[in-house]
């Protein structure tokens, strides 16, 4: 997925880290950098929980960690789209071309969105298909009648590509608010 995202530039080298030897792979990659390494991540969260509860999202912390202005996120984002693959995924998940709701949740980790928040419960529901490249969902996202999602890569993609009304952020992960610098088009649904 990461290689796909950066396939149009030679300036970025993507290094695969195996699950079998994660520590060793990372150590070898670090040794090849000659000290030119930019570290961004969750390990810098300690003490930030109060800020997370005040509507700051994880991506905002990442930008702050490396002192990059938030607007860089929107002004320089680009992914070379693949219309054929987007159409293939669209046809796979919506073969009858019905109006639909797109939903992104993470049932495997217990993050289930409450369907009673759907505006039109009669619409077909299309869920994330983990066998497909997230970037091939762009047409599905753009054409959805409603979108419901939690904090995820899909939420980020929706931030960039979706202009329609009826886009809902389900705040089901207490440590992941929408964020102060996300697109204003989101309606937030909070969970107790």
Q: Which residues does each PLM region occupy?
A:
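Catalytic machinery of carbohydrate-active enzymes
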Residues: 1-192
